[in-house]
Swiss-Prot record:
Alphabetical list of InterPro entries matching this protein: EF-G-like_DII, EFG_III/V, G_TR_CS, P-loop_NTPase, PrfC, RF3_C, RF3_dom_3_sf, RF3_GTP-bd
Record-listed GTP binding positions: 18-25, 86-90, 140-143
Keywords from the UniProt entry: Cytoplasm, GTP-binding, Nucleotide-binding, Protein biosynthesis
GO CC list: cytosol
Subcellular location: Cytoplasm
PANTHER family attached to this UniProt entry: PEPTIDE CHAIN RELEASE FACTOR RF3
One GO BP annotation of this record: regulation of translational termination
Role of this protein: Increases the formation of ribosomal termination complexes and stimulates activities of RF-1 and RF-2. It binds guanine nucleotides and has strong preference for UGA stop codons. It may interact directly with the ribosome. The stimulation of RF-1 and RF-2 is significantly reduced by GTP and GDP, but not by GMP.
Domain (tr-type G): residue spans on this chain: 9-277
NCBIfam families: prfC, PRK00741.1, small_GTP
Organism, as annotated: Shewanella woodyi (strain ATCC 51908 / MS32)
Protein name per the record: Peptide chain release factor 3
Amino acid sequence: MSGNKVEVDKRRTFAIISHPDAGKTTITEKVLLFGNALQKAGTVKGKKSGQHAKSDWMEMEKDRGISITTSVMQFPYNDALVNLLDTPGHEDFSEDTYRTLTAVDSCLMVIDSAKGVEQRTIKLMEVTRLRDTPIVTFMNKLDRDIRDPLELMDEVEEVLNIACAPITWPISSGKEFKGVYHLLRDEVILYQSGQGHTIQDSRIIKGLNNPELDEAIGAYAAEVREELELVLGASNEFDLEMFLAGELTPVFFGTALGNFGVDHILDGIVEWAPKPQARETEVRDIQPEDEKFSGFVFKIQANMDPKHRDRVAFMRICSGRYEQGMKMHHVRLGKDVNVSDALTFMAGDRNRAEVAYPGDIIGLHNHGTMRIGDTFTQGEKFRFTGIPNFAPEMFRRIRLKDPLKQKQLLKGLVQLSEEGAVQVFRPIDSNDLIVGAVGVLQFEVVVGRLKSEYKVEAIYEGISVATARWVYCDDERKLEEFRRKCSNNLALDGGDNLTYIAPTMVNLNLSMERYPDIQFAKTREN
């Protein structure tokens, strides 16, 4: 077996997705704890103590106690090497989150068991559907009062259109939470409260009918036996092929804050989640075992280190291997570059990468030449597909406090749009600058970063824009006619792509009817 294949087989690259406050950042911490990447988990809320969550390293994130940007963390677990991409869980985040899901091979979906499936989870699941990404589900917060577990699984099946197969099953909840029964191992893992920041071995009782269980939890033993008869009759068995096809999700129950159930998830991900998979290009599928190096940029982060005004491009390796000092071909620019200082990450901590394999995420120092979606190879001329831009959902006009700084404003906005923080639109018929985002917080982030990183003070004004669509047409004459008649609604985005800015959804629908030869696209390939 080649060294490359051994390394590929070991890797599991996944992201955590959830609605805000479902406990995602806590789970990230506990996953790192179980992976021996942390000695003690940071507490996520009320960060006055100075002990910040490891994955929340940007100043604004530390101030507010929420994850705004995507962090990348690598750690060993059992015989595997896990790459965890932590994505913003806050209500307001950027499409950066969506794109991160194109760089992983599986996802862990975290659900607040008291609330069930929430809006942001639905949106994120729509994105995972674009690539049929395998999903593992964790029903969190079992140490609180929760909804009926069967009802929770029914809701996942109905709302997210994915079959559920319980792997662990809770024994009561809230103050009476006793632990879980592991259906595949036929064992009960007992819960002890007060294990929030350290890992202790849980007591395990083999067999559901073991008299030790009655001694340990009393009347709850008979209750769970009765409940499981119903559960086994009403739910799906775990099917690996259906899981890998994105059609079925294994479901685990636990409490991240109580350090309970996180190791069960990790065991499942290492055992079932796919190793790095083949990736589509315009030419052919690229296999991870291919000898020649290839990778794509899915995120650009500016100024990760306030001491150095740097920008780092996050690259997912798809084939071959990265070696320090190697030559890469930047396909879009048609140039070769020598890379000797690529980085690996433990959230804000960076280390120089000497070698990295498919599934790994490395950081490349970027002086404004790299963009999201860029492909790097060892000479071949192909481009990875499926790294989209998504149409923004909210819009503001941005205005300078000092009109003489127009040049700096445009530079800052273009860089932030290349990074994926926001999108910028320049109307064809005016000198306005319109900023589009997926969530409100991104507007605040952009103004803050323009001030701190580009020394530009800007303010927002409301604007009547409902949505934006990228505009395409194979017939150049019809496109030109459309441009002439609809110039009031047309703009160029940060990459000079023609965009239709619709003041209302009614306006968009009318334009689509009036110009059937014009394609109005919600997403655009990078």
